[in-house]
């Protein structure tokens, strides 16, 4: 008869205690990481559209890439709603995280203040003369696919990481960069296209990013 198995003691008692950073120190460390990897600093397409030096083909391709970013991200918003740490507050009005993401999702879908955000991106491509079938069959760049689904990996893994990756590192940084205003003005001035999507995002991402900063300090 084989020897009976033994329940192994896996507790590592010789390990030192890990001390969490203070909120201020953690946020400062996070800000340094975000600053070192800020995509808006190295992006050459946005300023080229802003000053009118981008070809129309580049402008169209950027619009198609942006459509898929919105198409893939929007269905993930309910994860932030359902995973919010105060989702079971007495009422939604008593919550912060839950109420914020519920409003954010409603806004993205066109039920709160602005038009549906994915539809705005479709209208952006139509304004540039891109047929719907071309948009439907377009294959986004690997960089677009990788960046979107890396972010969604964190959204799916935990609320805290989703808040940090999407709300703080993306929406807040996007709002601070001023990219939406640059694109709105550049497209209107140099390509005779007025894009509602960028008009909306020039204020919406700033507002959402500010709220994400406050929520980050509360988790």
What are these regions (language model features)?
Residues 2-219:
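Non-heme di-metal
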């Amino acid at each position: 008869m084989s020897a009976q198995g033994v329940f192994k003691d896996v507790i590592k008692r010789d390990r030192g205690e890990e001390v969490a950073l203070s909120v201020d120190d953690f946020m400062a460390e996070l800000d340094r990481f975000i600053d070192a990897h800020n995509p808006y600093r190295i992006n050459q397409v946005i300023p080229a559209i802003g000053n009118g030096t981008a070809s129309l083909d580049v402008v169209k391709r950027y619009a198609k890439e942006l459509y898929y970013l919105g198409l893939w991200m929007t269905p993930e918003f309910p994860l932030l709603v359902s995973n919010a740490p105060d989702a079971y507050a007495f009422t939604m009005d008593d919550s912060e995280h839950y109420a914020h993401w519920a409003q954010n999702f409603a806004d993205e879908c066109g039920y709160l203040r602005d038009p549906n955000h994915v539809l705005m991106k479709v209208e952006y491509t139509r304004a540039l003369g891109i047929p719907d079938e071309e948009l439907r069959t377009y294959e986004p760049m690997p960089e677009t696919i990788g960046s979107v689904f890396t972010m969604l990996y964190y959204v799916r893994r935990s609320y805290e990481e989703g808040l940090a990756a999407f709300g703080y590192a993306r929406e807040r940084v996007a709002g601070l960069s001023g990219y939406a205003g640059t694109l709105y003005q550049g497209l209107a001035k140099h390509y005779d296209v007025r894009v509602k999507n960028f008009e909306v995002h020039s204020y919406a991402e700033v507002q959402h990013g500010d709220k994400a900063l406050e929520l980050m300090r509360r988790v």
